[in-house]
Amino acid sequence: MREPEEDEEEKSGDQAPRILGPDFLDHTACLPPNMHNDWISVLAAENNRRISDANEWNHVFHTPRSAEYIFTACTRLRLPQEVKYSALLIFDNFMVQLVSRLHESIYNSRRSDRKKYQEWNRIEATLSRQVTLRMLSAIQIASKMHSYHDSLSIQTVKLCLKTLGFAYTEESVVRSELRVLSMINWEPAYHSTPLVYIESLFKILKMKWEHVEVCNYWRYILLVLDCVFIHWNDVYKRMMANVLGPSADVVTREQMCRVQADWFLLACGVIVTASCCIDGMRTADEITNELHRLSNIPLADITDMSVAIIECIINQQGPIANISSIQI
């Protein structure tokens, strides 16, 4: 027989809110320090593959509006932070593949130019109506990648669409998910999201910098990363302008996409920006040096990335920017 007190304790434990983010103070199952370099090497190898695979069509549908929509949906659905970044990348990849194939099909058809134009207008209208469904499918897939047990169910996606004014059936939700997966060749994304790179570097930093306020830093890191994802093109254009000056205008889209594919650079820039906001430039410089040692990203590149992020954030605040939060 179980004691009543034990049952009550178990019930209260089940009702406790689950921690969806990383716990940097919990060292259970952590890699020992002598394996940190091995894990960084794994991330570096994946990072190099992603840079090599980058092309001019990456991030075409990664716009401020699509990022804000997906981020808002994930927030209201109370999904883990990592899901929204994966969902946005999946959605962008799917839309690029879908639109390019549809365009190729129309272009190679034997219709007259007028018929092709009419058919393409019809396709654009259909794609526009289905954008919300495709975004929810991308979120559903991303939630399964993070934790299948806690992923969005078909019923939840259907209810969410109904709340937004779309009367899709459960069968339509399933077909959409399969459509997204098949279009991206059943490869949702690289194994690690940008947040994994940030979390890994920050975890190693935390072991050396014990005085760092983990919760405060992580909150700022997530805010900064959200800003970067929402204002993606603006941040990288500013960074290239900082690096190349007037010559930045001749940078091709493919070259820009290769820079955007470097998630170690992104991770370092985000962490340094967060440290600059919290502890000022002196601490940010020290963290920059440590991140350079861990990631092999040049010091100047990390600085240029963080400066571009700060410039973008200040610019988004309007002409009367409140920069008091950034300690010089």
Residue ranges and their predicted role:
Residues 1-328:
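Acidic, serine/threonine-rich low-complexity regulatory regions at protein termini
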